[in-house]
Amino acid sequence: MKLSRRDFMKANAAVAAAAAAGMTIPTVAKAVGETTNAIKWDKAPCRFCGTGCGVLVGTQNGRIVASQGDPDSPVNRGLNCIKGYFLPKIMYGKDRLTQPLLRMKDGQYDKEGDFTPISWEKAFDIMELKFKNALKEKGPTAVGMFGSGQWTVWEGYAALKLLKGGFRSNNLDPNARHCMASSVVGFMRTFGMDEPMGCYDDIEEADAFVLWGSNMAEMHPVLWSRMTSRRLTNAHVRIAVLSTYEHRSFELADNPIVFTPQTDLVIMNYIANYIIQNNAVDKDFLAQHVNFRRGATDIGYGLRPTHPLEKAAKNPGSDASEPMSFEDFKTFVAEYTLEKTAKMSGVPEDQLESLAQLYADPKVKLVSYWTMGFNQHTRGVWANNMCYNLHLLTGKISTPGSGPFSLTGQPSACGTAREVGTFSHRLPADMVVTNEKHRQIAETTWQLPAGTIPEKVGLHAVAQDRALKDGTLNAYWVMCNNNMQAGPNINEERMPGWRDPRNFIVVSDPYPTISALSADLILPTSMWVEKEGAYGNAERRTQFWRQQVPSPGEAKSDLWQIVEFAKRFNVEEVWPAELVNQKPEYRGKNLYEVLFANDVVSKYPLSEIPDDQLNDEARDFGFYIQKGLFEEYASFGRGHAHDLAPFDVYHQVRGLRWPVVDGKETLWRYREGFDPFVPKGEEVRFYGKPDGKAVIFALPYEPAAESPDQEYDLWLSTGRVLEHWHTGSMTRRVPELHRAFPEAVLFIHPLDAKARGLHRGDKVKVISRRGEVISLVETRGRNRPPRGLVYMPFFDAAQLVNNLTLDATDPLSKETDFKKCAVKLERVVA
């Protein structure tokens, strides 16, 4: 048998991956598919973070038996992180759910009953009853859905159609509200369009990298490996890392900066001031491409209106701004001097100045990266805007090696939550429900009566919790997330609503998570390559995969669940007479027929799917539903700088970065020569704005919603670790990953521990104004907080750190600040 170099690489990687996962591959021939019982290989994007690494999935006898990094993927070039290497094992936890479970007592549904196996028909029977009762008694605002940045593109699109077009409810929001909403609003305010203008190719072009609240070494390790290579093979390259505590990314930092929580706002205004004072402004760029505006201040903290902080705010939730001049902006940032910034932030002056010099030096190509440290912030939108300010002042934007780049944490937070528009205020391709023209476009595309989509923004994630608690949201479907563990302020604002007898909660999940066990009905869900899918990663790259194995037992995909459930509702049951009268041909039809089996979605026959190719959903519905939904969805953005390639193209390539025009992807947006939507001769055009100009915002420092005081004397920051992803519902079922980091710990400065009589390994009670949790003291290891701050990951279901966190949000993005609340510690005596 003769092997090519590529086949040899694939074979070696397959053997290594299989061995690491505790499996065996008898011969190299199995990896390259040359024996009768060969492993079959196919491509897919990784199931975890928003990097979008490509993997090759090895299947045999209906199971995944191996995976490896895809050497043909331009994202990861054959490399995986530790989670990626164990992808097969996330599918086969011993407690995988395989049939619907309903709380029952004496053969009937009972809110306090035990989970009992039922059929899909009976599951949909009780769902139908509860959703119809809510719609009949209170109307569309009484039903809602909490979705996911892990949904495939067509799962999110189907949910959007069912909720906003079918049930006429804008109460659809994704868990990306907790991670990317501030980035979305920041992009929209500054540029008028969402998502980064650059791409991962910037890493190999840049001279400097600045990480703002981003531990790329653990959260985006494959991108970090590319950045590490750039830094270590080019002596002039510099890396600055800013965080409220030291972490693994600090190990490569030339300028490691630990700042006082919330003072990143101060630091960015100082850098803007430094750029201006040192004549480093690109004046020609500003004159041609930038406007200046002063933003509203004292905007509150997204708490309930009765909260003292909301009552005290002068402009709660205000997104208002007014024009100003460059000279006005210069005056505004002038107060953020080096001395003042050092005092407020706790950062030495020389480090601040060194950081500012990177931005100011016209010879230095620079990329700013950020993740949750910016976004999970009560002024997260401002933080995003202020970072854009620095790139716009210097013209370091939309060009190879320079630009601001928001990294995403979920595999399709961009492709599904943002681009499809599964937020409570959005529609596809940056359209919004508050815009009449946008609603008309959606209604026309979906062949719905005019006026079907409500104009009022629906309930965002935290507002959904509050509405459940208040009894105004009564039928609620949670899909592809574990929000009971991941969301803030569990005790006060989430659990009461879920267990309220007025409400019926459905959770679709592969595993019995905290959320599933808190629900009334659990629906078993297909995972990853048990269905055909598409994700969109952080660099605007859309990637497809085919179904490669069947789902276990009676598990069904989220797409199947949404579309099948739509059959239970006739249009007369969900639309008022005036809407039905506009479309008399819809009388007697159900939402499945109107939304999913219409002449656009259903026109692609099963004959387009090879006979030997798995596609359970398509064969159940009788047409190529994924293709139909994608092509209908893609029509929203084509010709409007959100262009996607034809469906079939994506199955042949390792993803394409939109806009895709005439078969060519776009690496850098808004720059002539790279972006087909920039007219010839304009050089740069931020075409999301009517005048083609981006906006620099004057925004001040404002304090956090909650800070340490005499009683609650420590900052608490929460986050993740390398080995686990989000709430650990997948990674904790991988024995190797679980053993590597079996339980959450409380990272604390040794002197803070000593002052409280605590030692490494001690049990400690962490207490906030909202709840408490018992953890273990860790004074060493990868995370090294400064005095006055503790850090705790949220993957451990036995240590619900979100019992402690405050449900304060950015008033503009409605994204929760998981990085700043006040706690105190008590030693637990055995």
UniProtKB/Swiss-Prot annotation:
Q: Which residues bind Mo-bis(molybdopterin guanine dinucleotide)?
A: 83, 150, 175, 179, 212-219, 243-247, 262-264, 372, 376, 482, 508-509, 531, 558, 718-727, 802, 819
Record function comment: Catalytic subunit of the periplasmic nitrate reductase complex NapAB. Receives electrons from NapB and catalyzes the reduction of nitrate to nitrite.
Question: Can you provide one Gene Ontology molecular function annotated for this UniProt record?
Answer: molybdopterin cofactor binding
Q: Which PROSITE patterns match?
A: 4FE4S_MOW_BIS_MGD (PS51669), MOLYBDOPTERIN_PROK_1 (PS00551), TAT (PS51318)
What gene makes this protein? napA
Subunit structure as annotated in this protein's UniProt entry: Component of the periplasmic nitrate reductase NapAB complex composed of NapA and NapB.
Output the SUPFAM superfamilies linked to this UniProt entry: ADC-like, Formate dehydrogenase/DMSO reductase, domains 1-3
Q: Signal peptide location in the record?
A: 1-31
Q: Which reaction does it catalyse?
A: 2 Fe(II)-[cytochrome] + nitrate + 2 H(+) = 2 Fe(III)-[cytochrome] + nitrite + H2O
Entry protein name: Periplasmic nitrate reductase
The upper taxonomy is:
Bacteria, Pseudomonadati, Pseudomonadota, Gammaproteobacteria, Enterobacterales
- Residues annotated as domain 4Fe-4S Mo/W bis-MGD-type: 39-95
User: Any idea which positions bind [4Fe-4S] cluster?
Assistant: 46, 49, 53, 81
Q: Specify where it is mainly localized.
A: periplasm
Which SMART domains does the record match to this protein? Answer: Molybdop_Fe4S4 (SM00926)
UniProt xrefs under CDD domains: MopB_CT_Nitrate-R-NapA-like, MopB_Nitrate-R-NapA-like
Family, similarity comment:
Belongs to the prokaryotic molybdopterin-containing oxidoreductase family. NasA/NapA/NarB subfamily.
